[in-house]
Curated annotation (Swiss-Prot):
Segments of this protein annotated with the region Disordered: 1-74, 86-220, 232-258, 305-350
InterPro entries, alphabetized: SCHIP_1, SCHIP_1_C
Biased composition (Basic and acidic residues): 1-28, 107-120, 150-159, 306-320
GO terms for cellular component: cytoplasm
Keywords annotated in UniProt: Coiled coil
Protein name: Schwannomin-interacting protein 1
A single BP term in Gene Ontology: face morphogenesis
Gene encoding the protein: Schip1
Residue ranges with Low complexity bias: 33-67, 123-137
GO MF annotation terms: protein homodimerization activity
Coiled-coil region: 421-455
Phylogenetic lineage: Eukaryota, Metazoa, Chordata, Craniata, Vertebrata
Amino acid sequence: MERSEQRVRAAWDCDPGKQADRDYREDGMDLGSDAGSSSSSRASSQSNSTKVTPCSECKSSSSPGGSLDLVSALEDYEEPFPVYQKKVIDEWAPEEDGEEEEEEDDRGYRDDGCPAREPGDVSARIGSSGSGSRSAATTMPSPMPNGNLHPHDPQDLRHNGNVVVAGRPNASRVPRRPIQKTQPPGSRRGGRNRASGGLCLQPPDGGTRVPEEPPAPPMDWEALEKHLAGLQFREQEVRNQGQARTNSTSAQKNERESIRQKLALGSFFDDGPGIYTSCSKSGKPSLSARLQSGMNLQICFVNDSGSDKDSDADDSKTETSLDTPLSPMSKQSSSYSDRDTTEEESESLDDMDFLTRQKKLQAEAKMALAMAKPMAKMQVEVEKQNRKKSPVADLLPHMPHISECLMKRSLKPTDLRDMTIGQLQVIVNDLHSQIESLNEELVQLLLIRDELHTEQDAMLVDIEDLTRHAESQQKHMAEKMPAK
């Protein structure tokens, strides 16, 4: 702005008419500055740059005669001063704006308390120079958007050259000042910032500074990957161990369950003598593994055949007479005969050696097993004859063949057609009662079979122990005989 004013001053100094007009303007500016001296002062740089010092020619024209010449010169001058000043300032406006912003930023950075400036304030600062003379300076108003310098017509110009704004009698021309923006609380203030539109900020030393966060330490990715791989390997080992434990426990449970099923179905004891000894009370290993000699193998063969014959006899009993239990008299007679034979054998076997005694016992066992099956059949026939008649025979006396068919559990369709509904209902009820009784009898027989199997296992173990003991005694006796 100083450059533009210097250029305007130089142009007017060259023309005497313009210089006279400038003297007239200077008198008016002095009057305007005296009227606005009560307002806030501006920077000393602008006031000093805009001071007007009259030249020698102007001093000579300050006389009364010179004032008349000034009026006549102004009347003869074609172009008024405001129009000329408008042209010059519009030409140098961009340069003035840049210089003014730099000066304001420098001044705001130097001052701690940045005063707010609002549009419409008259800034005048009295410079304290060496001569002590007071000189007031007024800044030029900001250009309007339409390019006009002054917001009012040239008619508002008075004789002293000042612009009087309507509604503001005490105000001078409005200077162009940046508006201070309000800063939100908590924001950090620093040095000057030109991009903020002339915003005055406190220096870094005056405000609170937010501490910067320290940088994160570097990560060792290789060690982290190794650690993760080790954790995954440990988890896999734990899973494998848990799976092996579950598999072992499930295998044990399956074995136990299979043994229980075999015991419940009754087929566990029908597989041979080895299983008899494996489930014996003493808990010794299987008989087939323990027996070494051919004599013991023969005993196993005999026992196996006996078990087969017993099973055949049981099957024949269940097929023929499931509804009739064994007679207690037959059991007692068989037990008495067994006792008599065992007593006689014990008396006769005392005088024999071990081998001959073993052969004789094996022969007797074979004979008993061979006679067991026909004797069982004869016992079943006797029980059938002693069986009670069906109650249906008493209800149907005129149909004896139906009672016989009921005994045989077989009826023809022609017989059923000849019977009434009541007679058929009686037959159905009788069949239900027989089914219940047969089921109860079957349960009792199964319990007896289990007991007999356990007794058989115990006998086989006893026989094995006795055989081993007898063999050891026989060897001991044989060793003593040559020594004598």
